[in-house]
Regions:
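Ubiquitin-like/PB1-type beta-grasp interaction modules and other compact soluble beta-rich domains
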Residues: 1-89
Length: 90
């Protein structure tokens, strides 16, 4: 077991979550580590740690080591999840 934000205890593997654009602004940092068994576990922990992040996660593309994944994707120790919110522009 590992401790996450605010002393929460979670089981699973250690994963780095890297935030981009508006997700980075809401989280207030570039990246952080959480533990979980699948993408849903880790993103749930991130959303619980940062007010407003849940809305951004709902519209973001999530990459696992550069590959788009769904919430049920299992995780391996040491992987990186990237949160890519939609980008505006043209």
């Amino acid at each position: 077991m590992t401790s996450g934000p605010a002393g929460a205890t979670r089981t699973g593997v250690n994963v780095t979550v890297r935030y981009w654009a508006s997700a980075r602004a809401v989280a207030g940092l570039d990246s952080e580590r959480f533990a979980g068994l699948d993408v849903s576990d880790v993103l749930g922990a991130a959303a619980a740690a940062h007010t407003g992040l849940s809305d951004i996660l709902g519209v973001s593309t999530i990459l696992l080591d550069g590959r788009a994944v769904t919430a049920s994707e299992p995780l391996s120790e040491g992987v990186t999840l990237e949160v890519l919110p939609p980008f505006a522009g043209g």
